[in-house]
Amino acid sequence: SYSDKISRGNVAYLTTNALESKLMEQTGFGSDGKYEITEKTLLKDKLKVTKDTGRITAIENTSLTGSSSLAKGQIKIDNKTYETAYNMNNLLGYNVTYYVKNEGKNDESVILAMPIQNQNNDLTISSELFSKLTTKNGNTAIEYFKDENTSKTNTAEISSDATLIYNGKYQAMDKNLIDLTDKSGNITLLDSNKNGKYDIVFVKNYENIVVDSVSSTGKIVDKYSQKVLKLDDTVDFRITKGLEEISVSDLAEYDVLSVAASLDKELYEVEVTNKTVEGKVTGK
């Protein structure tokens, strides 16, 4: 009814329709005044924003085929590089609808990108629900539990030529890297070509650290193993606590860090919690 609250989804739908609707312009004046619908839209001709579709093929630290030469805040859609209005790294590999703000001939930035419905099939499997690696139709596959309350497993088939992104960087496909047995993390599988097989495998493999001390140079010492993690300007890193991005200096003793490090140790993704570490004392 007219008194019901409108959902965010419907607001977005109505806004998009309004922005993309063709404009009406006056083509006759005086007694012959009339209006005609043109090919112009509010989005393109007034706001200087164009809409397009494509696939995000590279981000600042990696691409779907290897390394990346992009700067921070840039993405590549198909074969064209854009600046971005916010971090879109989580859309690597996805087919997206995107909006480009045109400020000038050489000044274009993507202000919004969204996965295209029905053109991306993804599945995230946590290490807790990971069962084992297996095969299906001659291809590597992952057997996993649908949830924690069932003993029944499902199987996800991985394409024979699938791309592997391990802890944020491209790697040659390696079964050992996608085997989450006795590990902490998750796997996201993406079928971007709708053939029923997953063609991109994103692995996040975390190592947990309990902060003992943090130096002014970015050296973080683990409280129980004395292992050292160094986050300084020689590496790329991002530290998040909840939805907030924080700095090394914000870390405190007993913070629990889940650290995903690329194999070359040049890229680190760190998630921070204040969870209490539980365990059993096995010796004096």
Please describe what each predicted stretch is.
Residues 83-99, 168-188, 242-258:
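Short nucleic-acid-contacting surface segments enriched for D/E, G, S/T with interspersed K/R
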Residues 35-71, 116-151, 202-225, 272-284:
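Structural detector for short beta-strands of small beta-barrel domains
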Residues 80, 85-87, 116-119, 130, ...:
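Structured surface patches comprising rigid loops and adjacent beta-strands/short helices at the edges
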Residues 72, 153, 159-161, 184, ...:
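Surface-exposed or flexible loop/turn and strand-edge residues in extracellular/cell-surface modules
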Residues 8, 13-17, 186-190, 223, ...:
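Extracellular/lumenal glycan-associated surfaces
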Residues 180-182, 229-262, 273-277, 282-284:
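Extended non-catalytic domains of envelope/secretory-pathway proteins
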Residues 194-198, 265-266:
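Acidic, glycine-anchored loop motifs typical of Ca2+
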Residues 1-129:
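Terminal recognition/anchoring or ligand-binding modules at protein termini
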